[in-house]
Amino acid sequence: IALDTLLRTTHHQGIAAEVEDPPYASLEDALRLAASRKEPPLLVALDGVTDPRNYGAMIRSALALGAHGVVSEERRAAPLSPLALKASAGAALKLPVVKVKNLPRTLKALKEEGLWVYGLDVRGEKAPWELDYARPLVLVVGSEGEGMRRLVRETCDELFRIPIREEAESLNASVALGIAL
């Protein structure tokens, strides 16, 4: 009962730890990780993903499926909160998680460094499995409710969409990322 009170939840399996907030990484950290693995960089950029459960699940999928980092804006994304950390199942402590001030500007800078920027969007004509993952790239995913902002979408070299049944309307953002990776 004491642990339930301290944590304000019963979902703890009898274990708790007090830890410092994890530090955010830099883009250079993510690019160094790719270089150390002798792989072309694969970054995931999240535009407006504010739900901490989705944010954590997306970090987890990014780690599991070979991405070298997850990038999002400081003001338009969920923080690495305890809920996001829990949803990431520890992935946020193993993969560079980067916060930037301006996502469109960051994507343009990455393009100048030789990375291709691809977005998941209903306007896309190709499916994500047609992506060339052998080239250095950033895969951009927008929020469930809004999708990518116009400036982010316009920065993309190409848009891809996941073909789904019309009656489904949309996918959860973390599920869409998992399918695309």
Predicted regions and their residues:
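Post-transcriptional modification and biogenesis factors for structured RNAs
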Residues: I1-L181
